[in-house]
Amino acid sequence: MTLDIISHSLTQTQRLGMRLGDLLRGGELILLDGQLGTGKTTLTQGLAQGMGITDVINSPTFTLLKEYHSSVSPVPVQIQGMVPSQHPYDGLALYHFDLYRLDDPEEMIDLGFEDYFYGSGVCVVEWADKANLLWPAERLNIRLKVLSETKRSLRFIATGAHYCELLRLFQKNTYATTGS
């Protein structure tokens, strides 16, 4: 399933992230691709807000990974193919990866990062195209492109039943709300 959205501002990109983040329950893998300045980190900031994370979110360019935890437990939402899980914290974990400085995808395996992609937290990976061979078949890809100084194109590509249902709910919630 594919969904194309045009964002007209950073604020709108962040709101789109919030709407998607509100639907995440754990175990999701979201892969972000786009050139510098397309809004990958802005979208991730919105995702974190939607998940109930109040920390300042910035790109982990030099550390490859930053971990955040929401202050609230996720509200149960029935999404096909998803099994509710217990989290060791009050809320949901967000694992924010940035592969911009990654030289070899094997480094991620050597560092044990692959384990995160099959865990109970939400993984968001910026510059995901640098490690295409590592990703599970089922996932949500988001490709961002600059259209103008403030305008961005976001293409959501869902692979697998869980991610298709997630994208359907996101589309319904996004277009059912005005002022996006």
Where are these regions (language model features)?
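N-terminal pre-Walker A segment at the start of P-loop NTPase domains
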Residues: 1-19
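Phosphate-binding P-loop
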Residues: 21-27
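Hydrophobic anchor at the beta1->P-loop junction of P-loop NTPases
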Residues: 30-32
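Short beta-strand-centered segment that lines the nucleotide-binding/catalytic pocket of NTP-utilizing
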Residues: 53-69
